[in-house]
């Protein structure tokens, strides 16, 4: 990969030089397309370790999302955080996402929803409350997070949160489906320019699956 350096720009932020992160990101995607999901996770995590090594420990630095190599590095950090969340290492995933938001304060990659899942898993309710306003109001993700958080916290889901979630029919159908297969058809759909509502709903389910398995009684509250 060559030497990786952090270079300041005229826009009061930084870019990452070296590392060929765009190629690394493409390689991880190609591994996934061939079914080598473990290999893709390892590729992303190794690159994440290289990225962390050049970031200063004592202060946060804003990275330039418009710079291709730097943007790819941020996407790698996000992808690795998702990998670790799905693998059950929630604390590492949380640390990665918090680092990502420090480096990308405008949250171009939309890491906040994934961080919300981490906070629910860790039962960090105050941290969750702080970031809830940053979740998009139009997305089906926010009502799901709010309903799931309430269930995780209290064992119940209030009528208003159920009502908000039921407005998103495709997601509710997916949550209650017998199977949630990430097959070739789904992968083609979700990677297209305009994914179907069904594919988007499945993507949300798959991202939340560890929590839905942990709080298995939640799905029953939707019926």
What residues fall within each predicted segment?
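Boundary/linker segments of alpha-helical solenoid repeat arrays
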Residues: 51-59, 105-112, 137-146, 167-181
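Long, ordered, amphipathic alpha-helical scaffolds
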Residues: 148-223
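Solenoid-like repeat scaffolds
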Residues: 12-17, 49, 66, 98-105, ...
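Structural motif corresponding to the intra-repeat A-B loop/turn of tetratricopeptide repeats
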Residues: 34, 87, 122, 153-154
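Alpha-helical repeat scaffolds
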Residues: 5-12, 42-46, 90-98, 124-136, ...
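Residue-level signature for tetratricopeptide repeat
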Residues: 30, 76, 83, 117-118, ...
